[in-house]
A protein has these predicted regions:
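Short amphipathic beta-strand and strand-loop transition segments with alternating hydrophobic
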Residues: 123-134
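Acidic, metal-coordinating catalytic segment for phosphate/diphosphate chemistry
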Residues: 133-178
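Conserved hydrophobic/aromatic beta-strand scaffold that supports enzyme active sites
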Residues: 140-142, 183, 253-255, 279-281
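Conserved Nudix-box catalytic region and its N-terminal flanking loop in Nudix hydrolases
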Residues: 160-165, 172, 177-221, 271-273
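NUDIX/MutT-family hydrolases
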Residues: 268-295
Length: 319
């Protein structure tokens, strides 16, 4: 099992090798292991194991694995086992999102400043029950809970639902020498589900932060995948909950400095993810014009264009 074997490394059969561990009797585990790429093997003593491909990349380093994956693996496995009623192909498709939303939950443990707002913590909420009311690529959880009120009392027991997603990296590519930005356009299900007359959106580059990946690395990867663009550097803009009343998704926003192409339009996206993306390279003034007209009508794009407006002179001066 090599060091880069991922969150759930599988053993490789080697002559004379030994593996210490606990044999699981969890009935759903074989399907999860198969979805993770495991091959079922029956050993001479009748023990069934699932093995991975022999990539000849060396021995597995437990300490390195624990540092990167130790906190993610147990809750992610529990989530996978909860999805084991699905066909293997469906479960395999869901695994990256399961890992990503587990990683986002762990990232949320790092507290943000509380200079004005209350510093009352997560542990002060009295959780009565938590159920998963929908399991799909995304997840919906239903909570029954009581929380502290500002007068010092506890609230009545309330039932609330939350849509559980992963964290995301958002990037606005900007060429300070040409004073141009790159936007992407694609069909979006949120506007379609709302009944929007035009469910194609102009947006910054954006995408899921995979488990074990930094927000910065995700930002660079998404620019390559969605726009065919290699960034020169990143400037952190801000981070925030995009809709804290009902959604767990958390955004990490960056300005990506790059040399943008001369062509105004292009086509990009990963065919494996059924992406159909058109890119637009716009002068900064034109980008601000579509904010004024309302054609730019999603929060990340508007927020980041206003940030660029405030920082544009500095960026152009140092380009």
């Amino acid at each position: 099992m090599p060091d880069d074997a991922g969150c759930f490394p599988l053993p490789v059969l080697r002559e004379g090798a030994a593996l210490r561990g606990v044999l699981s009797v969890e009935p759903a585990l074989p399907k999860v292991l198969e979805a993770l790429g495991g091959v079922r093997r029956v050993l001479p003593d009748g023990v069934v194991i699932y093995t991975g491909a022999d990539t000849n990349t060396g021995r597995w380093n437990e300490a390195r694995w624990r540092a990167r994956w130790g906190a993610i693996a147990p809750p992610a496995l529990a989530d996978m086992l909860g999805n084991a009623d699905q066909p293997v192909t469906v479960l395999r498709h869901r695994i990256p999102m399961i890992l990503a939303r587990t990683a986002s939950r762990i990232a949320a443990r790092v507290p943000q400043p509380a200079g004005i707002r209350s510093d009352t913590g997560h542990e002060s909420v009295e959780l009565v029950s938590e159920t998963i009311s929908h399991r799909g690529f995304f997840q919906t959880r239903t909570y029954r809970l009581r929380h502290p009120r500002f007068d010092g009392s506890m609230s009545a027991e309330v039932e609330r639902e939350v849509f559980v997603a992963s964290d995301a990296a958002i990037v606005l590519p900007y060429d300070p020498q040409r004073d141009r930005v790159l936007l992407i356009e694609q069909f979006r299900l949120g506007p379609f589900g709302r009944g929007d007359a035009r469910p194609w959106m102009l947006e910054p580059v954006a995408g899921r932060i995979d488990a074990g990946e930094s927000a910065e690395d995700a930002a660079r990867r998404e620019c390559e995948e969605e726009a065919g663009l290699t960034l020169e550097s990143l400037e952190f803009v801000t981070s925030y909950y995009c809709s804290p009343g009902c959604l767990t998704e958390y955004h990490y926003c960056y300005l990506g400095l790059a040399q943008l192409p001369e062509v105004n339009q292009g086509h990009a996206g990963l065919s494996t993810e059924h992406e159909d993306i058109r890119t637009h390279v716009l002068p900064f003034d034109k980008a601000m014009e579509i904010v004024a007209t309302g054609e730019a009508d999603n929060a990340p794009l508007i927020l980041m264009l206003f940030w660029l407006q405030a920082n544009r002179a500095r960026l152009r001066r140092t380009a």
